[in-house]
């Protein structure tokens, strides 16, 4: 029986941060679809401008405002919904729901919580209440005690005995959690742990060293019916956060009794918290005996549930939303299979592996070892019919330059067995690569198990891959049976070519000669045990026939996704994929998506006519084209991966949709692009190609420091650096040339004190439609970390006209057809071009939604029909839009927070306003942990660069009414405090905000680090600080639906 609700408010998760990523775009979108099917009016609160769900096709009304209780209350007051869903926006949404309930706001306006009740959520998320609940229902938990102060935590740890695990209540991604082996370690980190808890509570738990970690995904309706959708086995043992673990489904090493016992216990956990919808239950299993504990539960859609949904083909978020409306599991149809109800538990005839992706090399001083705090920024999911096939595919999907488990950089490095074992013991990311290296150098299974705790079942599989590869290398030739066996084990053509000393194309020719090709298999949730036809597909060599017939209809399109997220490639590229798909329906008979990211909307079952959940490579695209005969391949939505394969695809005779591979190569190669600008007479900073040290020194003696090193074919400023002296130059030039050794590195003069701006645009080879965007921070801060404004504020009309002329010239010269982005620096009223990206850009969802024109859709029209103009037409907004970066400093233990030309933010938020400061304030507040400072607290403002702006920020804060100090070691001329004084103030929770600028690690490392560890807002740029602090006193902050600002698409 459905709940009698007419209007439902859905709370989103806000900007992407470590441990709260695009899985909530997927889950929130599915919830909105489920509500719309019921004829229910939907209101969405979400400030994540990059997501698919913040497009008009999902919610009836959209508020891009901070996801906080006080902002959501304004929406409730305006819209008067009768229901609210808080389980589809991660921990952020749950915290907002709990606050709204505990403050009496939901009761005041008569808003019903749909799904799991708030009391159940609190029982799950408070470590103490959860422990008590488990004990009351007779479920085993590890020895543990809760604490709310540092002294209490130390006392409880003494009672339990070291080592202990500190778990944080009302928290995500294990933020602040630690393993302490002694009291000294606990004393050092417990203050940070308590600061990361929403309710200032931690659980001191006996540490279960090397125990196996398992997860069960449970659905439960309000009538008490339950179904276990997936069992996920973590290959990494307890102590490594599940978000950091390599995981596999179905579970491989459990016997039937173990599996069934924990299956029933997971349903008991769901019952104990009155779950309605979906939850994830985590267990610890003793590898040396039959003993297990319940660890925790997440009473909401989560990263694991998104993975389980994509792994099994069971639409968890959709079903969960239906259950929240009051339906039973028996009443809900599984729309993937189309033939079973939601009470059917999935059965798998394949193996799914998820591997996280880290970008730790972008951060200085960050702790590299994997532990109980999540640090990964994305993940990949592979599907195969053997562990080996699935694992090797997953390694390639990571896009870290490794061709598989064996045969890559680490495998052929000079690392000794002892070095490999040391890296394994340290828990460096991508342990399987070090395990393979250790086996290559003679390590035994027992030696690797001793330092990792990873089940020997998996280690034996990796060792067998090493042995097979080494035999291949010695043979230097291959027969038909061996080639087929290699492909079944997940070896790529490139991997085999390297082993045999031949070209990749030679292996492909052999496969074609011997008719060795992958088969297309479908995921139907039922392992073929029940009739079903699905569009959810993967490729495997462990099959004898294709599960589907291939359409001969012409005019077919393959859209390349962006793969696993990393810094610089996030949900904005998935928005581009879905936008292109929606826009292509009127042009193409058959459209398929190739992607492998389990977090995304584009990999959902009801988005494309066909979804190929598989690796993105030239080999795989050619396999698909051979079967499907696609007319076009679209690579411009695939981020850097798409651009990197575009030229090779074109060389293979594949037709690219939009701009040619030759033009993409010109734009991506820094030297070729710089020469193009010279040819067109377009200004750019002085530059030289770094081919020899002598040339570099000659150039620098001419232009002087600072200079900017810019490698080719990279995204998010990888290995890009401003250098100020010879020592820095030598250090970073080495790093840059390692990024892209086959392409020259360009060194250019860095323009100090310049404005940065960019243009998002669509071209048809002649005409251009574009949006001009201005950065708040000066040039030198990566565009992905910059605060952006539409419309521009400081640029003169003369400068903007020159920018538009330059862009128009480039479009004509390169015959740009499709979406693209051009970046400028403006110095002395002269625009200089610094970069051209011939693909969808990070900022395109923002610019499209602010000007109310989908640039991807516009670009497709230009590609296929043309614009009929030969000029630059500027798209302008009806209101102000500001986009702010989201940083995840608190998750990156030890990292030094600073901004530069290499991107460090993990997400973005945006808001609209009637003026710049209206939009800026809401946008900045949308990024965690930003908040309006309490006037009874203290602000800290200091720095040695942008000092005039820091002084403005200090004055604004004083006028606002808060006490302001500066750091005596980097003073701006107001009342000073020493570093030790400031650290004590932060620890005593007196500091409300920190505003600083520049790179001062030798002075203020401790100050910046403890500020983020204690969840204090920190602004790392003086110009932004001056603007945000002015916005604190802005009198007219609006909270309107986006259409009231004339925005949205």
From Swiss-Prot:
<feature type="binding site">
    <location>
        <position position="241"/>
    </location>
    <ligand>
        <name>ATP 1</name>
    </ligand>
</feature>
<feature type="domain" description="ATP-grasp 1">
    <location>
        <begin position="131"/>
        <end position="325"/>
    </location>
</feature>
<dbReference type="GO" id="GO:0005737">
    <property type="term" value="C:cytoplasm"/>
</dbReference>
<keyword id="KW-0067">ATP-binding</keyword>
<keyword id="KW-0464">Manganese</keyword>
<feature type="binding site">
    <location>
        <position position="296"/>
    </location>
    <ligand>
        <name>Mn(2+) 1</name>
    </ligand>
</feature>
<feature type="binding site">
    <location>
        <position position="756"/>
    </location>
    <ligand>
        <name>ATP 2</name>
    </ligand>
</feature>
<feature type="binding site">
    <location>
        <position position="835"/>
    </location>
    <ligand>
        <name>Mg(2+) 3</name>
    </ligand>
</feature>
<feature type="binding site">
    <location>
        <position position="780"/>
    </location>
    <ligand>
        <name>ATP 2</name>
    </ligand>
</feature>
<feature type="binding site">
    <location>
        <position position="167"/>
    </location>
    <ligand>
        <name>ATP 1</name>
    </ligand>
</feature>
<dbReference type="GO" id="GO:0044205">
    <property type="term" value="P:'de novo' UMP biosynthetic process"/>
</dbReference>
<feature type="binding site">
    <location>
        <position position="240"/>
    </location>
    <ligand>
        <name>ATP 1</name>
    </ligand>
</feature>
<dbReference type="InterPro" id="IPR016185">
    <property type="entry name" value="PreATP-grasp_dom_sf"/>
</dbReference>
<keyword id="KW-0479">Metal-binding</keyword>
<dbReference type="InterPro" id="IPR011761">
    <property type="entry name" value="ATP-grasp"/>
</dbReference>
<feature type="binding site">
    <location>
        <position position="282"/>
    </location>
    <ligand>
        <name>ATP 1</name>
    </ligand>
</feature>
<feature type="binding site">
    <location>
        <position position="751"/>
    </location>
    <ligand>
        <name>ATP 2</name>
    </ligand>
</feature>
<feature type="binding site">
    <location>
        <position position="835"/>
    </location>
    <ligand>
        <name>Mg(2+) 4</name>
    </ligand>
</feature>
<feature type="binding site">
    <location>
        <position position="296"/>
    </location>
    <ligand>
        <name>Mn(2+) 2</name>
    </ligand>
</feature>
<feature type="binding site">
    <location>
        <position position="174"/>
    </location>
    <ligand>
        <name>ATP 1</name>
    </ligand>
</feature>
<feature type="binding site">
    <location>
        <position position="749"/>
    </location>
    <ligand>
        <name>ATP 2</name>
    </ligand>
</feature>
<feature type="binding site">
    <location>
        <position position="835"/>
    </location>
    <ligand>
        <name>Mn(2+) 3</name>
    </ligand>
</feature>
<keyword id="KW-0547">Nucleotide-binding</keyword>
<comment type="function">
    <text>Large subunit of the glutamine-dependent carbamoyl phosphate synthetase (CPSase). CPSase catalyzes the formation of carbamoyl phosphate from the ammonia moiety of glutamine, carbonate, and phosphate donated by ATP, constituting the first step of 2 biosynthetic pathways, one leading to arginine and/or urea and the other to pyrimidine nucleotides.</text>
</comment>
<dbReference type="InterPro" id="IPR005480">
    <property type="entry name" value="CarbamoylP_synth_lsu_oligo"/>
</dbReference>
<feature type="binding site">
    <location>
        <position position="296"/>
    </location>
    <ligand>
        <name>ATP 1</name>
    </ligand>
</feature>
<keyword id="KW-0460">Magnesium</keyword>
<feature type="binding site">
    <location>
        <position position="298"/>
    </location>
    <ligand>
        <name>Mn(2+) 2</name>
    </ligand>
</feature>
<feature type="binding site">
    <location>
        <position position="239"/>
    </location>
    <ligand>
        <name>ATP 1</name>
    </ligand>
</feature>
<feature type="binding site">
    <location>
        <position position="298"/>
    </location>
    <ligand>
        <name>Mg(2+) 2</name>
    </ligand>
</feature>
<dbReference type="InterPro" id="IPR013815">
    <property type="entry name" value="ATP_grasp_subdomain_1"/>
</dbReference>
<feature type="region of interest" description="Carbamoyl phosphate synthetic domain">
    <location>
        <begin position="549"/>
        <end position="930"/>
    </location>
</feature>
<dbReference type="Pfam" id="PF02786">
    <property type="entry name" value="CPSase_L_D2"/>
</dbReference>
<feature type="binding site">
    <location>
        <position position="213"/>
    </location>
    <ligand>
        <name>ATP 1</name>
    </ligand>
</feature>
<dbReference type="InterPro" id="IPR011607">
    <property type="entry name" value="MGS-like_dom"/>
</dbReference>
<feature type="binding site">
    <location>
        <position position="837"/>
    </location>
    <ligand>
        <name>Mn(2+) 4</name>
    </ligand>
</feature>
<feature type="binding site">
    <location>
        <position position="282"/>
    </location>
    <ligand>
        <name>Mn(2+) 1</name>
    </ligand>
</feature>
<feature type="domain" description="ATP-grasp 2">
    <location>
        <begin position="674"/>
        <end position="864"/>
    </location>
</feature>
<keyword id="KW-0677">Repeat</keyword>
<protein>
    <recommendedName>
        <fullName>Carbamoyl phosphate synthase large chain</fullName>
        <ecNumber>6.3.4.16</ecNumber>
        <ecNumber>6.3.5.5</ecNumber>
    </recommendedName>
</protein>
<feature type="binding site">
    <location>
        <position position="835"/>
    </location>
    <ligand>
        <name>ATP 2</name>
    </ligand>
</feature>
<dbReference type="GO" id="GO:0004088">
    <property type="term" value="F:carbamoyl-phosphate synthase (glutamine-hydrolyzing) activity"/>
</dbReference>
């Amino acid at each position: 029986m459905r709940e009698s609700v007419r209007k439902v408010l859905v709370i989103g998760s806000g900007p992407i941060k470590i441990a709260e990523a695009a899985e909530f775009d997927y889950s929130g979108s599915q919830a909105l679809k489920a509500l719309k099917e019921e004829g229910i009016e939907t209101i969405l609160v979400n400030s994540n401008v990059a997501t698919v769900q913040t497009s008009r096709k999902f919610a009836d009304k959209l508020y891009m405002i901070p996801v906080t209780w006080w902002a959501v209350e304004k929406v409730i007051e305006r819209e008067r919904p009768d229901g609210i869903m808080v389980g589809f926006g991660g921990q952020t949404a749950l915290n907002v729901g709990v606050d709204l309930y505990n403050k009496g706001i939901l009761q005041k306006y008569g808003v019903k919580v749909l799904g799991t009740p708030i009391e159940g959520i609190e029982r799950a998320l408070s470590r103490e209440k959860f422990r008590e609940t488990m004990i009351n229902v007779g479920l085993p938990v590890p020895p543990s005690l809760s604490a709310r102060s540092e002294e209490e935590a130390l006392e409880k740890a003494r009672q339990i005995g070291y080592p202990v695990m500190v778990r944080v209540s009302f928290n995500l991604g294990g933020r602040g959690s630690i393993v302490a082996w002694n009291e000294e370690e606990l004393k050092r980190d417990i203050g940070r742990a308590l600061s990361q808890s929403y309710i200032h509570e931690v659980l001191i738990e006996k540490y279960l060293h090397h125990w196996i970690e398992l997860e069960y995904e449970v659905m439960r309706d309000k009538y008490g019916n339950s179904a276990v959708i997936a069992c996920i086995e973590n290959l990494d043992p307890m102590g490594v956060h599940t978000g950091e673990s390599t995981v596999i489904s179905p579970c491989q090493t459990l016997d039937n009794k173990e599996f069934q016992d924990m299956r029933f216990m997971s349903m008991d956990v769901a019952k104990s918290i009155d779950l309605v919808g979906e939850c994830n239950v985590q267990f610890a299993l003793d590898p040396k005996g039959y003993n297990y504990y319940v660890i925790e539960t997440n009473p909401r859609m989560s990263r694991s549930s998104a993975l389980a949904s994509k792994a099994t083909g069971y639409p968890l978020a959709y079903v969960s939303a239906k259950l929240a409306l009051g339906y039973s599991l028996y009443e809900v149809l599984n729309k993937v299979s189309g033939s079973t109800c939601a009470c059917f538990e999935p059965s798998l005839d394949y193996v799914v592996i998820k591997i996280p992706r880290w970008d730790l090399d972008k951060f200085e001083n960050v702790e590299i070892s994997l532990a109980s705090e999540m640090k990964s920024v994305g993940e990949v999911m592979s599907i195969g019919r053997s562990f080996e096939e699935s694992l090797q595919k997953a390694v390639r999907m990571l896009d870290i330059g490794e061709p598989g488990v064996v045969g890559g950089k680490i495998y052929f490095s000079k690392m000794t067995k002892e070095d490999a074992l040391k890296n394994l013991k340290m828990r460096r990311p991508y342990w399987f690569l070090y395990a393979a290296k250790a086996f290559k150098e003679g390590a035994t299974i027992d030696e690797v198990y001793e330092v990792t705790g990873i089940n020997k079942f998996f280690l034996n599989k990796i060792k067998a891959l090493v042995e097979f590869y080494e035999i291949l290398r010695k043979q230097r030739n291959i027969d038909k049976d061996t080639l087929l066996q290699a492909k079944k084990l997940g070896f790529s053509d490139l991997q085999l070519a390297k082993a045999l000393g031949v070209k990749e194309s030679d292996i492909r020719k052999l496969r074609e000669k011997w008719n060795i090709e992958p088969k297309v298999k479908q995921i139907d949730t039922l392992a073929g045990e029940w009739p079903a036809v699905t569009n959810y597909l993967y490729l495997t060599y462990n099959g004898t026939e294709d599960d589907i017939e291939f359409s001969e209809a012409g005019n077919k399109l393959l859209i390349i996704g962006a793969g696993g997220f990393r810094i610089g490639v996030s949900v904005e590229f998935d928005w581009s994929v879905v936008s292109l798909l929606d826009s292509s329906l009127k042009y193409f008979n058959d459209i398929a998506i190739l992607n492998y990211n389990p977090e995304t909307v584009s990999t959902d079952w009801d988005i494309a006519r066909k979804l190929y959940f598989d690796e993105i490579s030239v080999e795989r695209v050619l396999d698909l084209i051979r079967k499907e005969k696609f007319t076009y391949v679209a690579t411009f939505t695939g981020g850097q991966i798409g651009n990197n394969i575009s030229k090779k695809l074109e060389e293979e005779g594949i037709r690219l949709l939009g701009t040619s591979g030759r033009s993409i190569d010109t734009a991506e190669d820094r030297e070729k692009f710089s020469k193009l600008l010279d040819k067109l007479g377009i200004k750019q900073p002085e530059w030289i190609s770094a081919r020899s040290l002598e040339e570099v020194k000659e150039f620098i003696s001419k232009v002087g420091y600072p200079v900017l090193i810019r490698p080719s074919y990279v995204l998010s400023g990888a290995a890009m650096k401003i250098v100020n002296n010879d020592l820095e130059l030598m250090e970073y030039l080495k790093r840059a040339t390692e990024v892209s050794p086959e392409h020259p590195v360009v060194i250019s003069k860095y323009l100090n004190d310049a404005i940065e701006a960019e243009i998002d645009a669509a071209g048809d080879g002649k005409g251009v439609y574009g949006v001009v965007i201005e950065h708040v921070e000066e040039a030198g801060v990566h565009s992905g970390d910059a605060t952006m404004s539409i419309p521009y504020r400081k640029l003169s009309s003369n400068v903007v006209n020159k920018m538009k002329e330059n862009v128009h010239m480039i479009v004509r010269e390169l015959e740009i057809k499709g979406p693209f982005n051009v970046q400028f620096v403006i110095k002395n009223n002269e625009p200089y071009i610094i970069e051209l990206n011939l693909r969808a850009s990070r900022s395109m969802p923002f610019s499209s939604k602010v000007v109310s024109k989908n640039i991807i859709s516009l670009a497709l029209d230009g590609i296929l029909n043309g614009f009929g103009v030969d000029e630059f037409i500027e798209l302008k907004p009806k209101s102000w839009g500001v986009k702010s970066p989201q940083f995840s400093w608190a998750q990156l233990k030890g990292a030094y927070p600073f901004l530069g030309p290499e991107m460090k933010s993990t997400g973005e938020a945006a808001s609209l306003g009637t003026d710049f400061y209206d939009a800026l304030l809401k946008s900045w507040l949308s990024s965690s942990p930003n908040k309006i400072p309490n006037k009874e607290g203290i602000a800290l403002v200091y720095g040695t660069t942008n000092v005039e702006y820091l002084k403005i920020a200090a004055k604004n804060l004083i006028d606002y009414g808060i006490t302001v100090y500066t750091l005596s070691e980097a003073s701006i001329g107001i009342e000073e405090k020493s570093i030790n004084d400031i650290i004590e103030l932060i620890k005593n929770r007196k500091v409300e905000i920190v505003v600083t600028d520049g790179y001062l690690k030798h002075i203020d490392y401790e100050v910046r680090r403890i500020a983020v560890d204690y969840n204090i807002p920190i602004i790392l740029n003086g110009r932004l600080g001056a603007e945000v602090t002015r916005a604190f006193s802005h009198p007219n902050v609006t909270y309107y639906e986006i259409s009231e600002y004339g925005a949205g698409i």
